Amino acid sequence: MAKVSAIQKNKSRQKKSQRLHNKRSALKSKIYDKSLSLEQRFSLIIALAQLPRNSSSTRIRNRCELTGRPRGVTRKFGISRNKLRELIGRGLVPGVVKASW
């Protein structure tokens, strides 16, 4: 089980990222607009840098929904490989069966 503080930190990053996503993407699109002057684009870069670091989507870590484990998380199910194997073995994941040939 991961530390509760690490899980909470990641959740707050997700909330900040969702809240500031539109503002961040608007600034980025204006920065890459070649019709603007260099001074205007530079001021937009500074405005982007003033946003909180944790509002960037790259700082969000995929974590297991059950245990909070940061590694080995499957995108499709949102849980770690260990818990996925355990749940599949019990037959709790619909549509997934253990391979046998």
Swiss-Prot record:
Keywords: Ribonucleoprotein, Ribosomal protein, RNA-binding, rRNA-binding
Domain of life: Bacteria
Taxon lineage: Bacteria, Pseudomonadati, Pseudomonadota, Alphaproteobacteria, Rickettsiales
GO BP of this protein: translation
GO molecular function: rRNA binding; structural constituent of ribosome
The protein's name: Small ribosomal subunit protein uS14
Family: Belongs to the universal ribosomal protein uS14 family.
Region: Disordered, residue numbers: 1-25
Function: Binds 16S rRNA, required for the assembly of 30S particles and may also be responsible for determining the conformation of the 16S rRNA at the A site.
Positions of disulphide bridges: none
Subunit (UniProt): Part of the 30S ribosomal subunit. Contacts proteins S3 and S10.
Cellular component, GO annotation: cytoplasm; small ribosomal subunit
Organism: Rickettsia typhi (strain ATCC VR-144 / Wilmington)
Biased composition (Basic residues): 10-25
Pfam families: Ribosomal_S14 (PF00253)
